[in-house]
UniProtKB/Swiss-Prot annotation:
It is found in: Virion; Host nucleus; Host early endosome; Host Golgi apparatus. This is Minor capsid protein L2. It comes from the Viruses. Keywords: Capsid protein, Cytoplasmic inwards viral transport, Disulfide bond, DNA-binding, Host endosome, Host Golgi apparatus, Host nucleus, Host-virus interaction, Late protein, Microtubular inwards viral transport, Phosphoprotein, Viral penetration into host nucleus, Virion, Virus entry into host cell. Highly phosphorylated. GO terms for molecular function: DNA binding; structural molecule activity. The lineage of its organism: Viruses, Monodnaviria, Shotokuvirae, Cossaviricota, Papovaviricetes. Disulfide bonds join 20-26. It comes from Human papillomavirus 11. One of its GO terms (biological process) is microtubule-dependent intracellular transport of viral material towards nucleus. Minor protein of the capsid that localizes along the inner surface of the virion, within the central cavities beneath the L1 pentamers. Plays a role in capsid stabilization through interaction with the major capsid protein L1. Once the virion enters the host cell, L2 escorts the genomic DNA into the nucleus by promoting escape from the endosomal compartments and traffic through the host Golgi network. One of its GO terms (cellular component) is host cell nucleus.
Amino acid sequence: MKPRARRRKRASATQLYQTCKATGTCPPDVIPKVEHTTIADQILKWGSLGVFFGGLGIGTGAGSGGRAGYIPLGSSPKPAITGGPAARPPVLVEPVAPSDPSIVSLIEESAIINAGAPEVVPPTQGGFTITSSESTTPAILDVSVTNHTTTSVFQNPLFTEPSVIQPQPPVEASGHILISAPTITSQHVEDIPLDTFVVSSSDSGPTSSTPLPRAFPRPRVGLYSRALQQVQVTDPAFLSTPQRLVTYDNPVYEGEDVSLQFTHESIHNAPDEAFMDIIRLHRPAITSRRGLVRFSRIGQRGSMYTRSGQHIGARIHYFQDISPVTQAAEEIELHPLVAAENDTFDIYAEPFDPIPDPVQHSVTQSYLTSTPNTLSQSWGNTTVPLSIPSDWFVQSGPDITFPTASMGTPFSPVTPALPTGPVFITGSDFYLHPTWYFARRRRKRIPLFFTDVAA
């Protein structure tokens, strides 16, 4: 077998470019790579004309992170201290040799020549007046020890409390403290006594200075959602001892206002089939549903357990209606009953004494027959209310015809449109006259009967 030839590594693009550029035998990928004329170089060249990334350190390899530097992850930069005193340049101290004199000679100032400038003449008035005397008597001056108080105020740039007003330091001028105060004049002052505000104990007003504009809604108990199964319980033990419906041997009872926990064996039977596999009964809730007071509890079933200990089961809403919510009965004001001498009376009318003759005012129930005749007929109907405001009586009864004189020739059709016949009245509406009640001396109330009139 012929041995395989060893593969030699190709020279780099820079080495090939140095030898093949002059002869023109360079591969097509060498010249663009060395002269930076590839597609990527063209994109960077023309894209840099519109976007500037200077100062960010991109592609420099310095690792400085740009002008701002790198910030470690999970930390924030420390705040810079600003507002402090500005640094001043140091004062240059000239070295002094041991042989140099300790007395510094004064440097004479050179004369300043103002060419063409007007001469300034100091004013003769104002300013200080200097009085000199040639007395040889030494002056006696009262020199006393004075204490000068100097106050320095330093501001901390890291902590500044804007709510505290810093007092101004005293002003010093020639060793004297200048204090100014307004002039206080004596005037008459009026004394006004203070009164105590009236504190009312009524609950009509708000209890706080800024009452809430609206009342926050109470949290709603989602008892009728689709995730809950609705089960009605009729056993009265559900109100007082619900644990008896779930298990038999549960001697510990914590009360009806707390949630109940139950632990079952692998095989068990509940006293009530509706409470099978119940592992938790939540605290009760009393609600109103469609005019009923309802006692509710939410139960959790433990139908399935996972290896991690999680239980999977449905949630059930157990409820029992206690009693209906009755509305308040409407109150009707009743008038007092007044006993009178007569059997029939009106509570709104004044008492009456006259007793009319029963013969003149007799109304009996009878059958009346009305037949057509040549005389004109006059109809009359009177309605008397139940409450009569005066002391007179009117009988209301059926329509009765009264014969009157003929005022002209009556109109009678030749052929009647409908067959005519006699009209019979079989009933009437009326009140009996009070005089008929006195026939009986017993104080007995006679009921009034109302009948309809049929024609």
